[in-house]
Amino acid sequence: MAKGVREKIKLVSSAGTGHFYTTTKNKRTKPEKLELKKFDPVVRQHVIYKEAKIK
């Protein structure tokens, strides 16, 4: 089977709470770092989540 181009990434909260989401991203079409505004349940607000590598 062929290996897919989608890579697993972690979206880390910029609020500094340590909360994160995991998702996949196509590295070929979106080489830049992903930034999304998502809900952080620790601070109970929508904050910016930035892409980080899964270790």
From Swiss-Prot:
HAMAP family (UniProt xref): Ribosomal_bL33
Superkingdom field: Bacteria
Keyword Ribosomal protein (UniProt): yes
Gene3D superfamilies given in the database record: Ribosomal protein L33 (2.20.28.120)
Gene Ontology BP terms: translation
Organism per entry: Yersinia enterocolitica serotype O:8 / biotype 1B (strain NCTC 13174 / 8081)
Keyword Coiled coil annotated: no
Gene Ontology CC annotations of this record: cytosolic large ribosomal subunit
InterPro entries: Ribosomal_bL33, Ribosomal_bL33_CS, Ribosomal_bL33_sf, Ribosomal_zn-bd
Xref: SUPFAM superfamilies: Zn-binding ribosomal proteins (SSF57829)
Molecular-function GO term, any one: structural constituent of ribosome
Source lineage: Bacteria, Pseudomonadati, Pseudomonadota, Gammaproteobacteria, Enterobacterales
Sequence similarity: Belongs to the bacterial ribosomal protein bL33 family.
The entry's keywords: Ribonucleoprotein, Ribosomal protein
Designated name of the protein: Large ribosomal subunit protein bL33
